Swiss-Prot record:
UniProt GO MF annotations: RNA binding
InterPro entries: NAC-like_UBA, NAC_A/B_dom_sf, NAC_arc, Nas_poly-pep-assoc_cplx_dom, UBA-like_sf
GO BP, sorted A to Z: protein transport
Name of the protein in question: Nascent polypeptide-associated complex protein
Sequence similarity: Belongs to the NAC-alpha family.
Boundaries of every NAC-A/B domain copy: 6-72
Gene source species: Pyrococcus horikoshii (strain ATCC 700860 / DSM 12428 / JCM 9974 / NBRC 100139 / OT-3)
Known role: Contacts the emerging nascent chain on the ribosome.
Matching CDD domains: UBA_AeNAC (cd14359)
HAMAP family (alphabetical): NAC_arch
Keyword list, A-Z: Protein transport, RNA-binding, Transport
Amino acid sequence: MRKMMPMNPKQLKKLMKQLDMRQLEGVKEVIIKMEDREIIIKEPIVTVIKAMGEKMYQIAGGSEEEKAIINISEEDIKLVMEQAGVDYETAKKALEETGGDLAEAILRLTDSGVE
């Protein structure tokens, strides 16, 4: 098996130019959305590779967080608003924090004294 020789930065830069590769600067996070969850990659290294008229994005490094997507209906938000006497954003946040559980969201809001 051949051992790969390390490349110096100048050679690497030349190779990246030949392959039409470049690194995106200032990327804070990448979110991959799936039907039931999201994967959030913080502080990733993102490289764009152009080949045959297409762009490919390579994502590396960073810390990864996975969270479930909760679909909250407008009716649920309105119900929590009415029952707990709170504004739209407060009701929505409570539902998100409780995984969409209406009763739990209302109880949390009324027990905490939020008006």
